[in-house]
Regions:
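Conserved NTP/Mg2+-binding pocket subregion across the NTase superfamily
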Residues: 60-174
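Catalytic metal-binding acidic patch
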Residues: 23-58, 73-89
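A generic local structural motif
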Residues: 5-9, 25-27, 71
Length: 263
């Protein structure tokens, strides 16, 4: 039994833990030698931090217990040097949030279906009463067409064609030479761009990493010159205002053609 498996087994004994799931690249088959462990503990009550610290100290060379930057997490490095992130999620409230997307079709500004993707692609390590497996069955459904349309409508409007759209914001800050703001707005542009692209293909959003590679591999519908235009965008975003502006226009035009053809 590996040290990680021993750690998981010890967590089984915590009465608050309803399920343990392994997510991220180690669950989806996209892991490499640098991949960390993304571990999700679905709980019915908070697990005391002192108990968490006591257990993890046997397996980790570095620990940050009870970080709350995004979710409630223990961010650690295992004794073998591999990073491990342990996230604590209230089972009921988390699944209600997934249902809000999958069953009530609520779209966000980018990353709409990431948590849905996380649930249905996670590997179950422990499931005390079968509730996580039941949630996986509940949400393992075809991509709802109302959700698809809501994501595409909301995020294409963020990309272009409206006063607060990202393309116009990027052009304004690029003309000013504000590189920090250019970086910030291009990142937001990409969030909505990939949200549209995955929804258009009826695919759940895989998260923030390897998006260009995953889209190229998994999306049957891709805008014309998908990879080349992204390369040009990132190659000119700080150096050539005119080419940046022109590339943005090409990207939104090509995406809109794909939407118009396939929606």
């Amino acid at each position: 039994m590996s040290s990680v498996e021993e750690l998981f087994e010890a967590m089984h004994a915590w009465p608050e833990v309803e399920a343990i799931a392994l997510g991220g690249s180690r669950a989806t088959g996209n892991a490499d030698e640098k991949s960390d462990y993304d571990v999700y503990l679905y709980v019915t009550a908070p697990v005391p931090t002192q108990r968490r610290k006591k257990l993890l100290s046997d397996y980790c060379s570095r620990m940050e217990i009870d970080n709350n930057f995004w979710e409630n997490e223990d961010n650690c490095t295992l004794n073998d040097g591999t990073d491990i992130d342990i996230l604590y999620r209230d089972l009921d409230s988390f699944m209600n949030g997934v249902a809000d997307v999958v069953e009530h079709f609520h779209a966000s500004n980018g990353y709409t279906t990431c948590l849905w993707h996380n649930v249905i692609t996670s590997t179950i390590v422990f499931d005390r009463n079968g509730r996580f497996a039941a949630a996986q069955r509940r949400f393992s459904v075809p991509f709802p067409e109302p959700l698809r349309r809501n994501i595409i409508e909301r995020n294409t409007r963020l990309l272009h064609g409206n006063l607060p759209s990202y393309d116009a914001q990027i052009r304004k800050v690029a003309i000013r030479g504000d590189e920090v703001a250019v970086n910030h707005r291009v990142a937001a542009f990409m969030e909505s761009y990939f949200d549209v692209l995955f929804a258009l293909n009826r695919l759940t959003h895989p998260g923030e990493k390897r998006l260009e590679k995953l889209a190229s591999r998994n999306c049957a519908i891709l805008p014309k010159d998908f990879e080349a235009n992204l390369d040009t965008l990132f190659g000119t975003m700080f150096t050539d205002v005119d080419q940046l502006s022109g590339t943005l226009q090409i990207i939104v035009d090509n995406l809109q053609r794909s939407v118009d053809t396939n929606l």
